[in-house]
Swiss-Prot record:
It comes from Drosophila melanogaster. Residues 189-202 are annotated as: Actin-binding. Residues 1-104, 239-269 are annotated as: Disordered. GO terms for molecular function: actin binding. The keyword Acetylation applies. Residues 9-50 have a biased composition (Low complexity). Belongs to the troponin I family. InterPro entries: Troponin, Troponin_I, Troponin_sf. This is Troponin I.
Length: 269
């Protein structure tokens, strides 16, 4: 028994002795990797664990996972496309709406006011120039009267008189034409009124807008009240209690000859 135990312990010690020489081999490796780490470079990571067996592509679970990943990738791609399209549309809208900024509106308003003021000023200048031209045309240029002789003054006065005479004649002709046109317009208006009939607008009074509505409602209520449409019957055949007239007793009427006796008594009295 003791010999058997020794034989079993001897082979177990051999592997332990074989494992001891591996320690010095690990030391140089550690010494060789420590120097690069001291020079500022990180030590390489430990070797990864050995990968498991490769997955079978024909496995239904693997196929389902791949299909799920592909579907998720397609959904993400479509979402990205929609997001990009919406961003582009919003940018386009902002670019269109944001063209007339408050500053641009203010500048445009100032330019329009400036242009309107310039146009108004030009129109006033044009009217003033036209007025001066008409005055010069009708009245003529002023004459130098300080150095003029008596004969020249008379000629100037006669010229002004003739000009005034012509202007008055033209004025009278124009007024006559205006009166004539006014008369023709009034005559035509009278003819038009005669043809279509002159309509005089009557004086309107204020009426409540709810009055007609209330009348319609009352009319509808009366239509639905069927008792109002029934005829009144004066016969008392269908009354529950018939009222009997009070009859006088026979003794109060008296005998048939009592009336004649009463008349004779009254005649004698």
């Amino acid at each position: 028994m003791a010999d058997d135990e020794k034989k079993a312990a001897a082979p177990a010690a051999a592997p332990a002795a074989a494992a001891k020489p591996a320690a010095p081999a690990a030391a140089p490796a550690a010494n060789g990797k420590a120097a690069p780490a001291a020079n500022g470079k990180a030590a390489p990571a430990a070797a990864a664990a050995p990968a498991g067996p490769p997955k079978d592509p024909n496995d239904p679970k693997v196929k389902a996972e791949e299909a799920k990943k592909a579907k998720q990738a397609e959904i993400e791609r479509k979402r990205a496309e929609v997001r990009k399209r919406m961003e582009e549309a919003s940018k386009a809208k902002k670019a269109k709406k944001g063209f007339m900024t408050p500053e641009r509106k203010k500048k445009l308003r100032l330019l329009l006011r400036k242009k309107a003021a310039e146009e108004l000023k030009k129109e006033q200048e044009r009217k003033a120039a036209e007025r001066r031209r008409i005055i010069e045309e009708r009245c003529g240029s002023p004459r130098n009267l300080s150095d003029a002789s008596e004969g020249e003054l008379q000629e100037i006065c006669e010229e002004y008189y003739e000009r005034m005479y012509i202007c008055e004649g033209q004025k009278w002709d124009l007024e006559y034409e205006v009166r004539k046109k006014d008369w023709e317009i009034n005559d035509l208006n009278a003819q038009v009124n005669d043809l279509r009939g002159k309509f005089v607008k009557p004086a309107l009074k204020k009426v409540s807008k709810y009055e007609n509505k209330f009348a319609k409602l009352q009319k509808k209520a009366a239509e639905f009240n069927f008792r109002n449409q029934l005829k009144v019957v004066k016969k008392k055949e269908f009354t529950l209690e018939e009222e009997e007239k009070e009859k006088k007793p026979d003794w109060s009427k008296g005998k048939p000859g009592d009336a004649k006796v009463k008349e004779e008594v009254e005649a004698e009295a």
